[in-house]
Amino acid sequence: MKDPLNHYDHFLDTLGLRCPEPLMMLRKTARDLTIGQTLLMISDDPSTLSDIPAFCRFMGHHLSAKKADRIPYQYLIVIGCLE
């Protein structure tokens, strides 16, 4: 089975940044993408574990995949698509 985290349109590296910077960078990057594009975000900030899913729900994006068992945390987000 293919790992969905290996297939994405855009990449956002927020390693070393702390709240609220990863979320602010995600918001800015998402604005430049079109509906249906995928964004892989990596972070080492533990606050992203709750912030990213909440952001996706609030902004109407779909958190397609998440790896949070070790750093870097990885989030695959489908822009403007609830599912």
Curated annotation (Swiss-Prot):
It holds the Pfam family TusA. The active site is at C19 (cysteine persulfide intermediate). GO terms for biological process: tRNA wobble position uridine thiolation. GO terms for cellular component: cytoplasm. Signal peptide: none annotated. It comes from the Bacteria. It is found in: Cytoplasm. The keyword tRNA processing applies. GO terms for molecular function: sulfur carrier activity. Keywords: Cytoplasm, tRNA processing. InterPro entries: Sulphur_carrier_TusA, TusA-like, TusA-like_sf. Pathway: tRNA modification. Belongs to the sulfur carrier protein TusA family. Interacts with IscS. Sulfur carrier protein involved in sulfur trafficking in the cell. Part of a sulfur-relay system required for 2-thiolation during synthesis of 2-thiouridine of the modified wobble base 5-methylaminomethyl-2-thiouridine (mnm(5)s(2)U) in tRNA. Interacts with IscS and stimulates its cysteine desulfurase activity. Accepts an activated sulfur from IscS, which is then transferred to TusD, and thus determines the direction of sulfur flow from IscS to 2-thiouridine formation. Also appears to be involved in sulfur transfer for the biosynthesis of molybdopterin. HAMAP family: Thiourid_synth_A (MF_00413). This is Sulfur carrier protein TusA.
